[in-house]
Amino acid sequence: MLVKENRLTKRKEFGYIYKKGRSVYSKHLMLVYVPTKLKNIRVGFSVSKKVGKAHTRNLIKRRLRAIIQDLLKQNLIKTNNYIFVANSSITELSFEELKSQVLYVLNKDGLINE
C-alpha cells in the first residue's frame, strides 16, 4: 500500500494535473504528470469502466500500486505528481508486461532517476 504522502486523492488534484500536466502514451497506458515543489512523489490511478467490472479494475490498480511502490523504494522516479490512466486493452497484460509498460512511459520522458 502506498503511504498517504505518496497518494493523490482529491478530485481537485486530479483535475489540476489533467489540465496542466504533460501526457505520455504507450499502447496500454497513459501517464499524465506535472512538476511539483513538494519533496514527495504523489501518484494517482484512473481505470475507466470501459476496462471491465469492478474486480478487474481493482486488480489493475493493485498491480499498478505494487509496481510504483517498488519503484519508490528503489528511488527510481523523479519528484512529480503522476496519474496513470489504463486503457481497456490493459487487461490482457501479465504483471511483468504491465511493469515494462510503466517503465516505458516513465523512460519516454526521462522520469527515471539514473
Predicted regions: what is each one?
Residues 1-114:
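Positively charged, solvent-exposed patches that mediate nucleic-acid binding
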